[in-house]
Regions:
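Hydrophobic HxD+1 residue recognition
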Residues: 127
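The N-lobe alphaC helix and its flanking beta3-alphaC-beta4 segment of protein kinase-like domains
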Residues: 49-67
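Conserved alphaE helix
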Residues: 106-114
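C-lobe/activation-segment region of protein kinase-like
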Residues: 107, 119-124, 134-179
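Juxta-kinase regulatory segment immediately upstream of eukaryotic protein kinase catalytic domains
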Residues: 1-14
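Conserved protein-kinase catalytic-loop position immediately C-terminal to the HRD catalytic Asp
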Residues: 130-131
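Conserved structural core of kinase catalytic domains
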Residues: 69-107
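ATP-binding glycine-rich loop module of kinase domains
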Residues: 13-16, 21-54
């Protein structure tokens, strides 16, 4: 098992949870129990332009927290190594629940409630279902990314296409070998 250092604390990596536009997220074990360690990467992304990814994550976390968006708590930041330690939210992602037919209707209802917080603040989040976990009856957004509102990328026009058995979701699953 690999060990990651964050501000002098050791975290033993259990597994890769996922790779996003901005980094790799690992399930890790620390003295406080299971956590997520996100390592910022600098790999190119053809459809998204970043400035300082770490500062963007921190700014977006503060913005979304102030709105009351349920997210994992930010536990530590190591600016030198570009790593974040986040609360681990256990359970299957919304995508995994869609694939097994176990996503309850309350998940989409809660997503629409989140939109009622985001849109007046002129913000969108990444609505893709891998970014959400329903835990303890609460829908958590496990990413920290937010962007200025644009109707073409809001939940109704973009995100909802991936929250049901749609041609877009089936194409994504096939492209990523998950069908």
């Amino acid at each position: 098992m690999d060990t990651l250092q964050v501000n002098g604390h050791s975290y033993t990596v259990t597994r890769l949870l996922g790779k996003g536009k901005g980094g790799y997220s690992y399930l890790a074990q620390g003295s406080e129990g299971p956590v997520v360690v996100k390592q910022i990467h600098h790999e190119p992304c053809s459809y998204y332009q970043f400035g300082d990814k770490l500062q963007s994550e921190l700014r977006d976390y503060r913005t979304l927290s102030a709105l009351g968006i349920p997210m994992p708590r930010l536990l530590a930041v190591d600016e030198a190594q570009e790593r974040l330690v986040k609360q681990y939210i256990p359970g299957p992602t919304v995508l995994e629940q869609l694939q097994t037919g176990t996503l309850p209707p309350q998940a989409e209802e809660q997503m629409r409630a989140l939109c009622r917080l985001l849109y007046p603040a002129v913000l969108n989040i990444d609505y893709f279902p891998t970014n959400f976990i329903l835990w303890g009856g609460v829908l958590y957004y496990v990413d920290y990314e937010c962007n200025p509102y644009d109707a073409q990328w809001d939940f109704s026009h973009w995100g909802s296409r991936y929250w049901a058995d749609t041609p877009e979701l089936r194409a994504w699953l096939q492209e990523h070998g998950q069908n």
